[in-house]
Amino acid sequence: MKPDIHPVYRTVVFHDTSANEYVKVGSTIKTKREIELDGVTYPYVTIDVSSKSHPFYTGKQKTFDSESSAARFQKRFGHFIGAKRG
């Protein structure tokens, strides 16, 4: 490998602000902020959504209407189909 062309790989703390959870992950992201966790200073990045807060991973998914698109169309516009012209 050539020297001085690869980004620095280091442990970074990602803070999920919606769940107030901290996750330490190896990353090459550049940050200006730092945080101290367990007596060690790490680069710090805030994020809005992670596996700690996303509904798919937490099991708090919303269920959507399972009615087919054809049934919805028929309900909305079915009265036009049988109407007489004239």
Swiss-Prot record:
InterPro entries: Ribosomal_bL28/bL31-like_sf (IPR034704), Ribosomal_bL31 (IPR002150), Ribosomal_bL31_B (IPR027493), Ribosomal_bL31_sf (IPR042105)
Gene Ontology BP terms: translation
Keyword Membrane: no
Molecular-function GO terms, alphabetical: structural constituent of ribosome
Residues spanning the signal sequence: none
A cellular component annotation (GO) from this entry: ribonucleoprotein complex
Keywords: Ribonucleoprotein, Ribosomal protein
Domain of life: Bacteria
Pfam families: Ribosomal_L31
Binding partners and assembly: Part of the 50S ribosomal subunit.
Similarity field: Belongs to the bacterial ribosomal protein bL31 family. Type B subfamily.
Official protein name in the record: Large ribosomal subunit protein bL31B
Native source species: Salmonella arizonae (strain ATCC BAA-731 / CDC346-86 / RSK2980)
